[in-house]
Amino acid sequence: MNTLVLKIDAILSKHLKKQLAPYTISSQNIYVAFAAKKNGVTVLLYKSGKLVLQGNGANALAQELNLPVAKTVFEASNNSQDIPIIGSDEVGNGSYFGGIAVVASFVDPKDHPFLKKLGVDDSKKLSDKTIQQIAPLLEKQIPHQSLLLSPKKYNELVGKSKPYNTISIKVALHNQAIFLLLQKGIQPKQIVIDAFTSQSNYEKHLKKEKNHFPNPLTFQEKAESHYLAVAVSSIIARNLFLDNLDQLGQDLGYQLPSGAGSASDKVASQLLAAYGMSSLEYSAKLHFANTHKAQALLTK
């Protein structure tokens, strides 16, 4: 997938809207003046005059629309690393115990030698020991913003008749992490989010959030394998999640497993027997099926 970003004037904007009128789509982004989708390419015209084309046929559509491609601010494939990028990722969403850690990191091309020397890669490919060694070095060197939503707070916010669901809470966290990083004066050429939902669904939930920024977003599945900025965020977030999991375990006197398998069921049942439901409200995501499985284990 390619992303083209251009700056166009009012006359060209008016002409573009006329050309793409039959392909208009809705956008929840308050900074988008016009949105369309043609030939699998999403076209976003921002109120600032910035035009973004996202999709494998971006170049072809730009030529079809007679857009000034030569004036492209940047043209980047999913694995482009030659521009300053903010990348965000989250860890903990699939684990019963522990909170959710979301990190947004800013990586400039000048950081690449340092990152490659450390062996930065997707956190899922690295051992926890390696992550715990690398993460502090990254935190010191790379501008980033970390957020941790504790299990207790998660249970207050996520679920039936509550403000968020499992998708919208991640939208809120990613948006806030990126917003706070941009507030520090960071100026990326691209912002990449490890895709966990569609762009349209992301923008739908984003409309409910208080803080917004005008920068266009790139959504990429398995982005941590394509962008160093996302890989950095993946590592820092994983370390933050592990630290939180360890601290929660120390508080309760139990070693809490990562993930949502049978080991989590067993420990959860032990916590229920020792402390009652309040211990799971403090340490786990209650809406997971593990809660009912743990309760069932107590009756055996």
From Swiss-Prot:
Entry keyword Transcription regulation: no
GO biological process: DNA replication, removal of RNA primer; mismatch repair
Enzyme class: hydrolase
EC number in record: 3.1.26.4
Entry keyword set: Cytoplasm, Endonuclease, Hydrolase, Magnesium, Metal-binding, Nuclease
Recorded family membership: Belongs to the RNase HII family. RnhC subfamily.
Name of the protein: Ribonuclease HIII
Lineage: Bacteria, Bacillati, Bacillota, Bacilli, Lactobacillales
